[in-house]
A protein has these predicted regions:
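Glycine-centered secondary-structure boundary/capping sites
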Residues: 23-25, 72, 99-103, 125, ...
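Hydrophobic, Leu/Ile/Phe/Ala-enriched alpha-helical segments that form helix-helix packing faces
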Residues: 37, 53, 65-69, 124-132, ...
Length: 360
């Protein structure tokens, strides 16, 4: 169950952060836009600034862009052989320090493909003002700790752990994808996912990584953002949802899967309880794409990663309408750089031509 929280926790673009950037000489509207950029993308297009402010391609817009560049706040990038169009990377560290994000990765250089992905996420946030949007790890953690009536263990939040011993570091919400939280009397939360490949291998891991948290959220939507080149992949993404949430494993399945994963990793294991189950048989039984995603999660969290696969809670959420999966096609071309998003994918195990892929 969830409870209402203060509005100040529902927005990463907070009045305090806007005020901090206004001290650099920006107007309130300019500062508000820049906080969106710093938190959600690190890069932006002139089109996005004009859409947010309602300004035309005129002197006010050009003055704002010129100020960013001449002051060293942002670097203009003119990609492509013809250098048509321009994106702006806001990399000035004092701006990030001013909003309490001195180590945010958005200020660092990245590939053009990654920049385009971030532009897409920024668009998705800017066009939907029905929700408050959270972009930083700390903002998400603070919100859910306050909003959930029952405290969740840290392991229930999406996370990745690196290193061992004193060098062990845990990053929460490592996908760095915006989360929309309800305002006023609504209870629905929106978890964005940007499709960067035709084959939804990473999406399967995303679903498993968020499954514990989703079971604790009263109403939720996973919104898959589809660049034009991937719009035909929606069926595969629906199939991935069905695998993750509509087909819970039995306790015996989980036990055998854990046994197989340990043997696959090279551990010395006792014979399986099923005398007919050997490594070759298990490899065939658990060859589908859903189990490859489960193996990736198991490598991170051991058998605990498999427990969520037994729960019928998310299946029940989807069947009752508490949970939804929706697809939003991104309409823009992004300086003709959309082909740089992701890489060509292969064929997932377990899918055959002509498979009926129901909508979740």
């Amino acid at each position: 169950m969830m409870k209402s929280v203060s509005t100040r926790l529902c927005h990463s673009v907070s009045p305090a952060r806007i005020g901090a950037l206004m001290r650099f000489g920006f107007t309130q509207r300019q500062a508000q836009f820049l906080v969106h950029v710093l938190v959600f993308s690190g890069v932006f297009l002139e089109r996005q600034y004009r859409m947010f402010t309602g300004l035309a391609h005129g002197q006010k817009t050009q003055d704002f862009l010129a100020k960013l560049v001449t002051a060293g706040y942002a670097t203009p990038i003119t990609p492509g052989a013809l250098h048509r169009g321009r994106l702006y990377h806001v990399q000035y560290k004092p701006l990030y320090e001013a909003i309490g994000e001195p180590n945010n990765r958005h200020r660092k250089a990245a590939s053009l493909g990654r920049f385009v992905e971030r532009l897409m996420l920024l668009d998705a946030v800017l066009v939907d003002r029905r929700y408050g949007w959270l972009g930083t790890e700390q903002d998400k953690r603070t919100y859910f700790r306050e909003a959930l009536e029952k405290d969740l263990p840290d392991d229930w939040y999406p996370h990745l752990t690196f290193g061992t011993g004193e060098q062990k570091t845990t990053r929460f919400f490592p996908d760095k994808l915006p989360i929309g939280v309800p305002l006023k009397d609504d209870w629905r939360h929106v978890f964005l996912y940007l499709a960067t490949r035709e084959v939804p291998t990473d999406f399967r891991v995303f679903l498993l990584r968020h499954s514990d948290l989703l079971t604790s959220v009263d109403e939720w939507t996973v919104r898959v953002l589809l660049p034009r080149r991937f719009r035909k992949a929606a069926a595969l993404y629906r199939y991935a949802v069905r695998d993750a949430f509509l087909m819970p494993l039995t306790p015996r399945d989980t036990e055998e899967l854990d046994w197989y994963f340990r043997a696959r990793r090279g551990e010395v294991v006792c014979p399986a309880q099923d005398p007919d189950l050997d490594l070759a048989t298990a490899a065939r039984r658990f060859s589908a794409a859903r189990f490859e995603a489960a193996y990736r999660m198991w490598q991170e969290r051991d058998v605990q990663a498999l427990w969520a696969l037994q729960s019928p809670t998310l299946r029940d959420h989807l069947q009752r309408g508490q949970g939804r999966v929706e697809f939003a096609e991104l309409p823009h071309q992004y300086l003709q750089l959309t082909p740089l998003v992701g890489v060509p994918g292969g064929v997932e195990k377990g899918l055959m031509e002509g498979d009926n892929l129901p909508t979740a």
